[in-house]
Curated annotation (Swiss-Prot):
GO terms for molecular function: neuropeptide receptor binding. It comes from Caenorhabditis elegans. The keyword Transmembrane helix does not apply. This is FMRFamide-like neuropeptides 13. It is found in: Secreted. Residues 1-17 form the signal peptide. Keywords: Amidation, Cleavage on pair of basic residues, Neuropeptide, Repeat, Secreted, Signal. GO terms for cellular component: extracellular region. Residues 18-43 form a propeptide. The modification Phenylalanine amide is found at residues 60, 73, 85, 98, 110, 123, 135, 146, 157. Pfam families: FARP (PF01581). The lineage of its organism: Eukaryota, Metazoa, Ecdysozoa, Nematoda, Chromadorea. The keyword Secreted applies. GO terms for biological process: neuropeptide signaling pathway; regulation of cellular response to heat; regulation of circadian sleep/wake cycle, sleep. Belongs to the FARP (FMRFamide related peptide) family.
Length: 160
């Protein structure tokens, strides 16, 4: 009788030790207490904020708040995303951006609704520079250009 009681109590303690962290966070959020183990809980287990208050670093899904990034690097939830996938966003929002300034011109931009001056692939620091690789209908923009002279492309595929 004593061994079975000891076995059951050890089993309950082991189950309590392997409690899911999700359940712990929900318990902390709603301030629920376990009536059987109140003496074990002296204080809350963590001082971290709940997940409902945090903006996700990586989010998958279509429905989100306007401007919510899909992949974000940094602690500020309102930070401009470095990598964004989606159709419904501002026309100037980059899909892939390298740099800290959110108003920086994108290096790589894919989309139909981009302004004609927006580069599809650009290498360099100056956003006003002609892109090195540009795929589009504009005949003035080079398709592939290597070198410093920006007057004419070295490789051009097109009608004009």
């Amino acid at each position: 009788m004593m061994t079975s009681l000891l076995t059951i109590s050890m089993f309950v303690v082991a189950i309590q030790a392997f409690d899911s962290s999700e359940i712990r966070m929900l318990d902390e959020q709603y301030d629920t207490k376990n009536p059987f183990f109140q003496f074990l809980e002296n204080s809350k287990r963590s001082d971290r904020p709940t997940r409902a208050m945090d903006s996700p670093l990586i989010r998958f899904g279509k429905r989100a708040a306007d401007g919510a990034p899909l992949i974000r690097f940094g602690r500020a939830p309102e930070a401009s995303p470095f990598i964004r996938f989606g159709k419904r966003a501002a026309d100037g929002a980059p899909l892939i951006r390298f740099g800290r300034a959110p108003e920086a011109s994108p290096f790589i931009r894919f989309g139909k609704r981009a302004s004609p001056s927006a580069p599809l692939i650009r290498f360099g620091r100056s956003p006003s520079a002609v892109p090195l690789i540009r795929f589009g209908r504009s005949a003035a923009a080079p398709l592939i250009r290597f070198g410093r002279a920006s007057s004419a492309p070295l490789i051009r595929f097109g009608r004009k």
